[in-house]
Amino acid sequence: DYDKDMLIDSVIMKTSKKLKNISYPRLIMIIRGELKTYFIPNENNVKHRINRLIQLGYIKINDESKMYEYIP
């Protein structure tokens, strides 16, 4: 499970860094597309990983647009 969490984290960070702003549905679609050759991530686990990255200060939620933003 630890390896899966690290893979999910890396895709979230790579995607948010590349796009700067991203909606939740699009982020889920990209994560599943990137990881489908390894495993299909559980949506609850993805939500947990996003919340963890928010707590660590890597990404944040824009209150107006409800999109995730990369924090450089």
Predicted regions and their residues:
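A short, conserved structural fragment
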Residues: 54-64
